[in-house]
Regions:
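N-terminal ordered "arm"
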Residues: 2-66
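Intrinsically disordered, low-complexity linker/tail regions enriched in polar/charged residues
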Residues: 42, 196-198, 303-307
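Short conserved micro-motifs at the rims of enzyme active sites and ligand-binding pockets
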Residues: 59-61, 237-243, 268-272
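Ser/Thr/Asn(+Pro)-rich, low-complexity disordered segments
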Residues: 65, 70, 98, 102, ...
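Aromatic/basic-lined ligand-recognition segments
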Residues: 131-218
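Low-complexity, glycine/alanine/valine/leucine- and proline-rich hydrophobic stretches
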Residues: 207-257
């Protein structure tokens, strides 16, 4: 791992919040296209990938055109790439409404229909639609770099944690509504979603899962860092050790929280994310009856390409 990837920068909520709020709104524009895709349990179909430059939709297919949308945080633009060509929309000073109009014009030039809804979701006190959001916002390249660095580092750790799980696991990525980076492990165990929650949230909780992720926080909880929870929530979460010094159970939030400042001061922050996730899964095994044999070897591809199956089984089972 390079020195740059080893550098875990300090993150201050107040410094990043304006751009995080702006980007959260912008990614919902292309994010709406993922709702046209087949539903994957846990909303795995809406995940945005963390790329070397920013955030990107999966490959999307409409009648007559195949495309993806890349929010290039490090370049300050959005690239719509299709089989018939590409278009670039700059992310300079402006409003969400202005961006939405420019995006739809660029998409139309490639034969891509506009998103089927204009609604902005999961952002408290926001304008109802993209066209209604006329607040002038600035693009801050420094904040964009910090956002990408945090997402990239956290994704690296979460992917390492997630890799050995043998059950269903959507790819690690950003959920464009709540704008958190998420890794979830699922099992076939029907559950009863909370009736008071929005429909899309209820349908995310039809089966049991374990979630570990990263969040930039919000106005009600202005703290950047890792989070985790077990659905349904079991008893006995209080007073446990969560694999990393500084990780604590927050009963009010229903989350295990690992603040970024605590994480970056760990001897090995990458490994600390893995240990954090492992501790949460161990709690699911001990308190919620999750199977312990759903975890395979945590090794790289070279190991699995050269090690006989009987040796893999002997060492990891």
């Amino acid at each position: 791992m390079s020195e740059r990837r080893n550098a875990w920068p300090p993150l201050v909520y107040e410094d990043l919040a304006p751009l995080v709020g702006y980007v959260n709104r912008l990614v919902q524009v292309a994010g709406k296209y993922t709702l046209d895709e087949p539903f994957e349990v846990g909303w795995g179909n809406v995940v945005l990938d963390v790329t070397p430059r920013g955030l990107k939709t999966p490959t999307l297919r409409q009648r007559g055109v195949t495309f993806s949308v890349h929010y290039r945080l490090l370049d300050g633009d959005v690239v719509i790439e299709a089989d018939v060509g590409s278009r670039t929309v700059p992310l300079s000073k402006g409003s969400v409404a202005t961006f939405y109009a420019a995006f739809c014009d660029a998409a139309a030039e490639l034969g891509i229909h506009r998103p089927r809804t204009l609604l902005i979701c999961e952002i408290p006190d926001c304008a109802p639609t993209f066209e209604d959001d006329h607040v002038e916002r600035s693009w801050d390249p420094g904040a964009a770099l910090l956002m990408w660095e945090a997402l990239n580092l956290a994704a690296d750790g979460l992917e390492t944690w997630q890799a050995p799980f043998l059950g269903h696991r959507p790819r690690v990525g950003v959920m464009w509504g709540g704008f958190d980076l998420s890794a979830t492990r699922h099992r076939v165990q029907p559950t009863e979603p909370p009736p008071a929650r929005p429909t899309f949230m209820q349908n995310a909780q039809l089966e049991a899962y374990v979630a570990v992720g990263f969040s930039f926080g919000d106005a009600t909880a202005p703290s950047i860092g890792m989070y985790a929870y077990i659905w349904p929530q079991p008893d006995g979460l209080e007073g446990r050790y969560w694999g990393v010094d500084g990780a604590v159970w927050n009963a009010d939030a229903g989350l295990v929280l690992l603040p970024w400042d605590k994480l970056r001061k760990a001897t090995d922050p990458h490994q600390a994310i893995v240990a954090f996730g492992d501790a949460v899964y161990d709690a699911a095994v001990e308190l919620a009856g999750w199977p312990s044999d759903l975890i395979g070897p945590r090794v790289n591809g070279w190991y699995m390409s050269r090690t006989p199956p009987e040796a893999v089984r002997a060492q990891h089972h």
